[in-house]
Amino acid sequence: MIILKRAGGSRRSHMKESQNLENLWMPFSANRSFKARPRLMNEAKGMYYKKVDETLVLDGTSGLWCCNAGHNHPKIVQAIQNQAGKLDYAPSFQMGHPLGFKAAEKLLSFSPSSDFQYVFFTNSGSESVDTALKIALGYQQHRGKKDKTILVGRERAYHGVGFGGISVGGLPLNKKHFSLLDNVDHVVTTHNLEKNAFSRGEPEWGCELADDLYRIIEKYGADRIAAFITEPLAGSTGVLIPPKGYLKKIREICTEHDILLIFDEVITG
């Protein structure tokens, strides 16, 4: 936790202590504007938030895609209460607990391929991305491919707020103030309003944009590229569905050139 001292000025003394909004630095928010006209959610049930003034707000993004079964679902609430009353926390460093192994087995039972054999749990999307990048680089080193150190992302992509995710992500404003990872490049985005503005489902236009990965391969050589990362569905940059055949073509190119493919997926499951 980092606490920054205010450069000057006084707190808004008219605000009750229980309503003091000064101390929380909110991510991806215009803090001054928010605190001048706060939107405070007090409860949630089903698909709605309830503000402190009792106004209902439709949650169109399922709590940043974390509550796809709805808010305050009774079975989920009961499961959380039961587990907290039995074992609230157990580290996974040199010890474990039965439900962790059970959850991993359950997840693999949903897998479309027997190639998936292991699950590594993380605490957030940002941590997941940085962990996936580290696993990819470590895997290439472990199998003797020591020159495979280049990571490839896409323009306009969002991969969280860790240094790895910002580096492979394609949002310039997120990179503006930071020194990023070396050995990172990007293919073009599939976002094109002129071609896909009113598409329903997967757009018909844009599969050929997957071929831009060949440009990166020609630039560096496949023997230097460790992994390609993409969002199957780009959420925070517009809920953009990939063109028909795009992901299949990306998969084929990566397989052909011995490049790992990372799907950063938190929305469609």
Predicted feature locations:
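Glycine-rich loop-to-alpha-helix module at the N-terminal edge of alpha/beta enzyme cores
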Residues: 28, 56-145
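PLP-dependent aspartate aminotransferase-fold enzymes
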Residues: 105-227
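Short, acidic, Ser/Thr-enriched surface-loop or helix-capping motifs
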Residues: 51-52
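Active-site-adjacent loop/helix segments that line or gate small-molecule/cofactor pockets in enzymes
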Residues: 15-48, 95, 209
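Alpha-helical transmembrane segments of integral membrane proteins
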Residues: 235-236
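Catalytic PLP-binding core of fold-type I/II PLP enzymes
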Residues: 240-269
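Short, low-complexity intrinsically disordered segments enriched in A/P/G/S/L with frequent Arg
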Residues: 7-12
